[in-house]
Amino acid sequence: MRSALHRPSPPRLASPTVLIGQGFALWKLRVIGDRLDLNSDIVDLIEDCERRTVNNTTLDLVIALSYGSRKELTNVVKNLAKKSVTGEISVDEIDESMITQCLETSDIPDPDLLIRTSGEKRISNFLLWQLAYAELVFIDCLWPDFNETEFTSAISEFSRRERRFGSTV
């Protein structure tokens, strides 16, 4: 593993608008996170890209900007508490399904696999609710060094696992 100081610079990416026009035409862009923390020009660009891709169905590309799962879950709890206080819902109606429906990712399937690079063995406040039954694969290489070989290795490890979705048997 190379250190960050000796790693070549990652290639520069084109702007999202250029990417959409050059191959992302079938992808739906979704950005999750707190947009209030972002510059208004960035928010405008995000919203423009999301609008342009809203009807694309080949792939959902989800980018997390200014996202924290604890903050997301706190917002869900606050919103459900407000609805309970105003009588829109009763406390007894609140269940896993209702919470899931209130998440930013409510219309996206939960991940089957999380590949974590850099050798870190943690999920770092990322999709805490959504990763409940995901398989986790930890890769020692740093993100800029992650390549097809690393990806294939992670998929191979994932395919050898017996998924139990919370069952202990």
Where are these regions (language model features)?
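Flexible, compositionally biased loop and terminal segments
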Residues: 1-169
